[in-house]
Amino acid sequence: MNARIESLPRAQYLADTHEVSNLSSELCDYNMFTGDAALCEAVRREGGQWAEGELSEFGKLTGSADYLELGTLANKFLPEFDTHDRFGNRIDLVKFHPAYHQLMKTSIEHGLHASPWTTPGPGAHVARAARTYLHTQVEAGHGCPITMTFAALPSLRLQP
């Protein structure tokens, strides 16, 4: 069993009826990058080997139990749309769970929204694609606004 789950006292659960033996343990606290041989090979083959250290650190983050929990929370607590405030004023506000905001913040901090444009070079798109692949395994929904931001720059550059 997973050490994180085993550390919880069994008496905490009043319905201690049986031991679950037909399910695998939780996949967490591992390095998503170094644990993915195909991804590591693709990054090397396509010119992103310079980013392997950074990708390994990012893989530790995305594979951690606490970070995976953010993805669970972002999906469990769906966005809420408020049309009016408590005084009846129209606000049209979408409220997201704080976990969603943390996922967005991390995406931006790690350049998923723009890194090949802000730091161009050989393998820049490969490194960004690998980070995006790792991060969307945690939670994919936040990838839409991140990808739209990333995709907007080439279009904007075509404008006179």
Task: Indicate residue ranges for each PLM-predicted region.
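Extended, charge-enriched "interface" segments that sit outside catalytic cores
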Residues: M1-G121
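Glycine-rich flavin
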Residues: F96-P160
